[in-house]
């Protein structure tokens, strides 16, 4: 029962409430241990069109596929959650900028395929905003807001882009 309360029923990932608490604790550990970390908001490109064109059952299939794809792109101990809708949040404790960048290049390099319930195959891509810890903040609210601003800039560039928070561009 506790597992159901902490996880998103559709994707099996941590849900927003559970992830918020765990990420706040992980951010505190990052500060205490002198680590660096990466906080990313990942948004599925054109997800509304999937629901509108293929139906909500297909949209659910796509979200579950994205969750699996994200689990394969990050380390086992990284916190990955479905934040809501087609938005996912990831916190990678003890990760340098070049490592998260490498993972995001792989994630963004091309669309990947998802098979819908009717066996049609569609291409998926994601856009991502990243805030680095501690340089972009330590408090959960701060890193979330900064990653969100970076995501907005990434989406303004088109599909399958990622951007790191930059104070001069994202303020």
Can you describe what each PLM-predicted range is?
Residues 2-6, 12-38, 45-75, 81-85, ...:
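Conserved long alpha-helical elements within nucleotide-processing catalytic cores of c-di-GMP signaling
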Residues 39, 88, 126-130:
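A structural signal for short, well-ordered beta-strand segments
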Residues 5-8, 45, 49, 109-111, ...:
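Residue-level signal for pocket-adjacent positions within structured domains
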Residues 80, 120, 127-157, 163-171:
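Cyclic nucleotide signaling catalytic output domains
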Residues 82, 97, 109-127, 155:
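Catalytic core regions of nucleotide second-messenger enzymes
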Residues 34, 74, 115-118, 137:
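Residues at alpha-helix boundaries and short interhelical turns
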Residues 13, 41, 123-125:
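Short aromatic/basic micro-patch
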